[in-house]
């Protein structure tokens, strides 16, 4: 359990929807969207690395128990929430997810408070696709997708409507923004077909990186190398996952106009 006591806990409301947000650091903002089952200690660890790089880390509490260790039971409980199911179903149909609307509002709040040219965002696992959906917003200058895992029943699916992908591509071209994406080669939740589909839709604006499975540390209850910057990251010099972590944080820093540490 991580008490998260080095973060400032706030509440943010938009369209009658209120979520807690944990904020740490100074400098331009980076939204760290948690993976299932929520803000785990490893998600918080990544946010602290963002903070220590001279950026402001903002973690919205979208589901689960804040600070709790991950487990299959907690993930099933989070996925089974009616509110969470409605969010993902709306996103999948292209009808426009209230969650994306709220996250775009949060991006505006964070940008107004922290300044800089814009914000960064990283989505992980179930929230990986949300980072791409947010890239329609000109505030988002550094979008990162880490093992985007939806839809689970279609390895080539992007979980974003075709018209929305066209609009996102146009915005990326207009503002010269690229999308970084990461997965492990043998990840059964985020397979090669999804990255192929995203490459087809986004062209050279999509910058994928595929890590070999033997670069992963722990795999956790999922049973395969999966969580690139959290559970499976090995925080040691010379480790590929640590290098990827550094690459992502440098991408945030340079895109948001601060010197990379």
Go through each PLM region and give its residues.
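N-terminal cap/leader regions of alpha/beta-hydrolase-fold enzymes
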Residues: 1-261
């Amino acid at each position: 359990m991580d008490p998260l006591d080095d973060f400032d806990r706030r509440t943010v409301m938009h369209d009658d929807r209120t979520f807690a947000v944990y904020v740490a650091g100074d400098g331009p903002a980076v939204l760290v969207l948690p993976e299932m089952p929520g803000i785990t200690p490893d998600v918080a660890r990544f946010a602290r690395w963002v903070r220590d790089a001279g950026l402001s880390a903002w973690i919205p509490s979208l589901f689960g128990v804040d600070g709790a260790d991950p487990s299959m039971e907690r993930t099933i409980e989070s996925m089974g929430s009616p509110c969470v199911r409605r969010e993902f179903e709306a996103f999948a149909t292209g009808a426009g997810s209230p969650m994306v609307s709220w996250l775009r509002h949060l991006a505006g709040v964070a940008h107004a408070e922290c300044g800089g040219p814009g914000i960064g965002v990283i989505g992980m696992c179930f929230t990986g696709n949300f980072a791409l959906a947010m890239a329609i917003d000109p505030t988002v200058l550094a979008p990162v997708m880490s093992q985007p895992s939806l839809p689970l029943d279609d390895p080539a699916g992007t979980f974003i409507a075709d018209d929305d992908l066209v609009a996102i591509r146009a915005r990326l071209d207009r503002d010269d923004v690229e999308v970084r994406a990461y997965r492990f080669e043998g990840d059964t939740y985020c397979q090669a077909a999804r990255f192929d589909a995203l490459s087809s839709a986004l062209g050279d604006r999509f910058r994928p990186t595929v890590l070999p499975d033997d670069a992963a540390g722990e795999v956790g209850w999922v049973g395969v190398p999966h969580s690139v910057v959290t559970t499976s990251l090995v925080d040691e010099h010379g480790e590929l996952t640590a290098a990827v972590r550094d690459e992502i944080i440098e991408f945030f820093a340079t895109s948001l106009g601060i010197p990379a540490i």
